């Protein structure tokens, strides 16, 4: 039988890593109302589905479907963290404020929300 990583890891572990990558929380960008999204846990399903938990919920969550909701910005930030080695940055729109002649009035440095999310996938052997 092929490996079933989502079921082996479980829904709560998937939710934990979702939180590490900035899901289920507002990004703090500060423009317009913002949704934190939702990365469901077993307790969330117990509350919202009258205590009934089915294994398929884990599979749906693993592929971002079912009760999982995320914003486009959350998704972009998580991809950036994957690409840069595990640092989740606070999103910002402005890098610097300049006068009409190009003089810098104020600069905004990148701010780290979480550093070194780390490796969470087990190493796979290529030998058969």
Show the residue positions of the predicted features.
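Beta-lactam-recognizing serine transpeptidase/beta-lactamase-like catalytic domain environment
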Residues: 1-128
